[in-house]
Amino acid sequence: METLANRLDVCQDKMLELYEKDSNKLEDQIMHWQLMRVENALLYKARECGLTHIGHQVVPPLSVTKAKARSAIEVHVALLQLQESAYAQDSWTLRDTSREMWDTVPKKCWKKRGVTVEVRYDGDETKSMCYVHWRDIFTQNYSDDKWVKVAGHVSYEGLYYIHEGEQTFYVKFKDDAYVYGETGKWEVHVGGKVIHHHAFDPVSSTREIPAAGPLCTGDTTKASTETSVGATEGPQQKRQRLETLNWEQQQRQYPQTPSTQTTERASQPLDVTRTSDCDTTCPYTVGHPSDPDCAPVVHLKGDPNCLKCFRYRLHKGKRKLYCKTSSTWRWSCESENQAAFVTIWYTSYSQRNEFLSTVKVPPGIQVILGHMSMFV
């Protein structure tokens, strides 16, 4: 107990030094969140040992310290990734990297240079609400998870930013129009200017995509339909849809027999949960495991931030147990609140089995086995 108390004192003293230092360097904020992780880990261990007090400090319940530790890990990993970007030398204060800032809309982004926007519902000053418009928003690319800085915008419709050609609203004024008003109309006051309804020019998040030819012989009707859908998609949805179509084409070339499917299931570890997001009427089957053009993979499904943390740990300590990992991805038909995926690629089934028997997957992440065509 004495050792635990001493470690906790040292950890908290270092945190106080950082608060007094009031640094604007990113490395100091990373150290702060590292200490937050250590503090909650020590408190968790103390409670696990049956301690309710360490000196004059009350030890919180296990559920509280566990939640705080997970929160600290999430922010810490995000800052470590930010340190590898072009914005590592920018000014970053404790306020800029706080959990409250991380959870403020747009969530899971870093934000700077906030400006107050006043919205008067029904044009009545007594029915006004204030929102924060962030002029600088730091978000991650869909493809490689690199941090980029985009500009925030204000329109009659709401507050938004444009990233990789997609317009994302983090505040929509119409959601509050009938909460604070009655007519469903409002005025936007920002920077000494007023945006009225008649001045509203909605910005579309879609762009025209050049029509493509049929994907393969015999699929002309289907290809023309898919092309018309692609014309209204953003780059993320279009990219995911084309990958899906490419996957479906390859499955037609390598159909799997029922006997092969049974053999494959029998050869896989029993302690791994196998699931499928398709129903039993899905016309496409998994690629032939013995095909030289197929590679074994594991799809990890869960909360996107948990997946990023787990992928980061794999990259640091288990790099020899797999070939490569994908960025975090979602099906384009699902909302932002749905579970995300990370795909891990292996050079052989023995390497995948070694990975599954060695690496402990966090409880909140679901493991799905499969194969993928070796297209790269």
Curated annotation (Swiss-Prot):
Residue ranges of the region described as Disordered: 211-271
GO molecular function terms listed in the Swiss-Prot or TrEMBL record: DNA binding; DNA-binding transcription factor activity; nucleotide binding
Superkingdom per UniProt: Viruses
GO biological process: DNA replication; DNA-templated transcription; regulation of DNA replication; viral DNA genome replication
Spans annotated as Transactivation domain: 1-206
Keyword Phosphoprotein: yes
Any Gene Ontology CC annotation: host cell nucleus
SUPFAM superfamilies named among the record's database cross-references: E2 regulatory, transactivation domain, Viral DNA-binding domain
Keywords (A to Z) from UniProt: Activator, DNA replication, DNA-binding, Early protein, Host nucleus, Isopeptide bond, Phosphoprotein, Repressor, Transcription, Transcription regulation, Ubl conjugation
Keyword DNA-binding assigned: yes
InterPro entries, sorted: E2/EBNA1_C_sf (IPR035975), Nucleotide-bd_a/b_plait_sf (IPR012677), Papillomavirus_E2_C (IPR000427), PPV_E2_N (IPR001866), Reg_prot_E2 (IPR033668), Regulatory_protein_E2_N (IPR036050), Regulatory_protein_E2_N_1 (IPR042503), Regulatory_protein_E2_N_2 (IPR042504)
Renumbered residue ranges of the record's region DNA-binding domain: 294-376
Glycyl lysine isopeptide (Lys-Gly) (interchain with G-Cter in SUMO) crosslink site(s): 301
Localization terms from the record: Host nucleus
PTM description: Phosphorylated. Sumoylation plays a regulatory role in E2 transcriptional activity.
UniProt feature, compositional bias: Polar residues: 218-237, 246-266
Self-association state and partner proteins as the record states: Binds DNA as homodimer. Interacts with protein E1; this interaction greatly increases E1 DNA-binding activity. Interacts with protein L1; this interaction enhances E2-dependent replication and transcription activation. Interacts with protein L2; this interaction inhibits E2 transcriptional activity but not DNA replication function E2. Interacts with protein E7; this interaction inhibits E7 oncogenic activity. Interacts with host TAF1; this interaction modulates E2-dependent transcriptional regulation. Interacts with host BRD4; this interaction mediates E2 transcriptional activation function.
Entry's family note: Belongs to the papillomaviridae E2 protein family.
Function: Plays a role in the initiation of viral DNA replication. A dimer of E2 interacts with a dimer of E1 in order to improve specificity of E1 DNA binding activity. Once the complex recognizes and binds DNA at specific sites, the E2 dimer is removed from DNA. E2 also regulates viral transcription through binding to the E2RE response element (5'-ACCNNNNNNGGT-3') present in multiple copies in the regulatory regions of the viral genome. Activates or represses transcription depending on E2RE's position with regards to proximal promoter elements including the TATA-box.
Official protein name in the record: Regulatory protein E2
